[in-house]
């Protein structure tokens, strides 16, 4: 019988750790949430940084009418990452989560879900129901955000229905009114006939629809002596026949040429017809109208036709020909006839044209979208239906030249998804013209990410209408306006605003509906116009964008936070939403932008790039993801993305992220397992570290610098890739693999082993802090498994300082030298792999490698032979001059190592004694 081999495993320093290989995040994270995050961590972080420089990221409030979705998750994870990083850098960084609660969506859902008839219950009861509804979803969303690891003052969020928030908002309105920026006017606004309210620009979305464009003949009644008016028509073109009852004029281009085209005799009534059309469009229109026999009998310059009167086809009034301009109706020759149907009640440009030329205004559609008596025989018809009936009437009565099917982009309500209309109604407006130049200047003071955001916002402000701030709803902040009972004059004073603020601060805005006007106006209030002392209240509420757009005052100033905020971060749709409404109110009230920086993100789409929607059934719930993969996987997904663009999300993508997570986790686990007996209070001095350790610290130093820059510039995708590269390439595939022999086989308390442990500890300590803003749950788990110095013996890495680079570790000479060594390793690795495939060796320790080189290359290899052997993890290495392989820069030969395999370290040696190589024998004897 052969002699039984001894078991030397008990003499090795094998890894020991309770840190599991598998994260089991869905189970572990809720435990961490309860034990750490919900145990006063946020307050402890603020206390640690008290008195330090502030950093305020102001939270754009999500609408509290449903559970959190993937877009919410992306947004809040980005915010949480920034705030965590800033706090670890020592900033006093409070985060006050917000909730948007007022307005139409909540009203609609409350009515649908609870079966309410709004007209049959008191306003205050209806408002209380809306409040209960939105409070429920606010609580649901709060739990959702906390599950994602988002830290903040969840016990004291700001909610747009809070009394103090509402009172401050009323103050913002009062300040703008005092400065003359608020006025009441009859102007066209976006109007949803289903919701029966005006809409903001940010509340509309465009969809492609198929409709009918019509070419309509307006008979000339007064030609100003330019031509014979008999049987002569000006032809207009419109895609909205329902607006024809509002037609008050026909706009043409002053500098265009117009032709009077005579058609051949009409067979039915044997009369000649003459049509006036822009010369450039005659051929196109005639072809569309299927008219082949025609001739031009007269031409005019557009300016000559100004003042010509045409009879409205079906109403008893005239339509005057007027001249367009760049600031009113801008007539083009791309489509139509060069003569634009102008209805001042139904469009911004038409309205401005009407003002310029005193055309007057007729609003022939009511709140519900039905034509009124002003529409003549079409009264009572829903506007969309009247498109067909008006077109049919025009055809039957000889006024329709042609109807053509077209596909065009049309505005829809973002809530009910139904088409909307432009319609003039009496509304309250904020006059953007009053402070537009100041807003444009303020935009230039802001740092925009991406930088094209500055141009985008500037162009929007340059072209935007006055802001319609009134809404015909009840769930919201009331417009704090009284009207004189006798003469109807609006009554708004500093005293009335203050009185309403005082009432709202204690009783909330329900008081506006619960109390009589006499109990809300200041004592001694009199109408400035007629002296009457009796008033009635405005019934409209403020646009919800005024709610959230005022939070720089109602939250930042009200709570004593920094104003302007350091950062606003929202989706790229908020250029026309919250970014803009906040900018307008802030400049109007204080003359400054409400933010120093603006960062925007894209939308979340599915794996195929499609928008997530209920109809497609492709929505992804962040809570479902957290319960299946873990919130840290969702956090890594968000931070790995190019969030400035739309971000794809699917199970396959999350599985890929999980693979990266496992590599990061296993790097941490390896280090934890090999530092179980290391005391961080007793590090090995830098000069006593081995050269490969010093190289590892150069890589760590680079990681710290790169990730610091990445976090500072919000380049989270770069940070994710830097960490992944460091863990996989620098650590797992190189450094940690190479030092395994030293860790396992050297004497436990030897300088060599302690040097490796010191280096690994520095690496893990920095790595866990870099990871804390990213994968906060896992970082807490790693932190609790680590040994710590007394100085950093804190319960959470969030209470530690973010790592800083160490100048001593910046060893350029070592970095350059090891870059060459790594190149050698990569060349030899291919030959080792080939030998393994050919069964020459089992693993690299079975190998003896010979490298052939010459000149400086040979000299470098010879000088660093021991280091190269260490890096290759082989039992034997020879460096020989010349005889290299022709096809490669280095010649490499791999053969099986000679001697016998040491039973302890597994290296081959020619001088084994009792199964041990001389090195292992020496270690055991010590």
Which residues are covered by each model-predicted region?
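Protease-associated
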Residues: 245, 249, 256-342, 348
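Alpha-helical recognition segments enriched in aromatics with Gly/Pro capping
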Residues: 357-369, 473-475, 494-646
